Amino acid sequence: MKVLGVVVEYNPFHNGHLYHLKSAKKLVKPDFTIAVMSGNFCQRGEPAIVNKFARAKMALLNGIDVVLEIPTVYALQDAGGFAFGSVGLMHKLGLVTDIVFGSESADISFLEKISKILYENSKEFDYLIKRELKKGLSYPNARKFALQKFLKTDLDTIKKLENSNDILGIEYIKAIFKYNSNIKYHVIKRVGAKYNEQNLSGKFSSATAIRNAIKFEKNIKEYVPESTYLILKDEFEKGRGPVFLENLEQFILSEFRLKARENLENIYGFSEGLDKRFIDSANISTNLKEFIENIKAKRFTFSRIRRLIFHAIFNFEKNYMEFSNKLGPQYARVLGFTTKGQEFLSYAKKKSTIPIITNPSLKNKILKDVLKNSERKWDFNISLYNWQFEKDILASNIYTLFYPNSSQRKSGMDFRKPIIIEG
């Protein structure tokens, strides 16, 4: 049995995603296709434009059989943490045979070579990165120059690593090595606009450009499948979107005005005096843009700052985050499936080394049931299972506060049933 896995955000699902999915299926010829998808918050440290159930529906209507949620504690990390959580989810299901990712270079041998070097020489490479960071460089630039020195190669070769999808590709392969997984990896050449292209540019426009167009009320119909367009239209009409970081500007500023430095000392990622920068900035800034720009320094990227905003709001304690980055995801949360996907889930429940959660209300019962099966070699920690799950619930409850329509802002989104699509 061949099972294709793709790591996605679908924020929102657009023509480029459909091209990637069709190409991946053509390459692998799978019996089932699953997507592991960011929930209500995405890797760049921003809320998704519509909620995770709406985006799961987009995926199911366009060829995905099962959508699983990447736990929030991984979805809001840098490329390495994001990949470790995403690949871990697929690996622990025990059935995924192939992963396909998009890449600007599409040079799988180069990506594999870099991944292997970084995996096998992580301590030496980390030392070089720290040395570059001390020069005041941002992490991406420090990583680039450290790699150039480590490989003793020219900067033009290393420039490939400035592409976001190539960086993620390297981290996916590294994660496969870390888990000692048998998952095969493949690459597809990315088509159309760059990942972070701000403006609409032809049929294959970036998700960033599409979100910007939505913000400025431009027509996006030609850049997304019809099903995506209709789902977005329905969510917007009901006041459940579009959701942007600015929607919760006052909430974010008040959160950091209420905090003291000691509140941030135990939060994952708050090092190098960032705790003071956040507190000071909250007190002198009048809006979110000012807040982020006042924190920004040469070595801190905007994405890192945005992620840290939510690390603090969701209370991502260092010890639990480090534990998470050692053990990987502790459960597989199902957001939706097709009737074909239901067949896959029946197989997965027999092979998975982590609990599969289709109904969050039954989380504790599911835990008791899996622990009764002592013959299976389980790969999760009960304390971490509960902690990661609680962060997903909290993230959803905060996310609904971003909704334009106040009547839609109730908590408890996660306790709905998963989406089931016929066919």
UniProtKB/Swiss-Prot annotation:
One of its GO terms (molecular function) is ligase activity, forming carbon-nitrogen bonds. One of its GO terms (biological process) is tRNA modification. GO terms for cellular component: cytoplasm. InterPro entries: Rossmann-like_a/b/a_fold, tRNA(Met)_cyd_acetate_ligase. This is tRNA(Met) cytidine acetate ligase. It catalyses: cytidine(34) in elongator tRNA(Met) + acetate + ATP = N(4)-acetylcytidine(34) in elongator tRNA(Met) + AMP + diphosphate. Belongs to the TmcAL family.
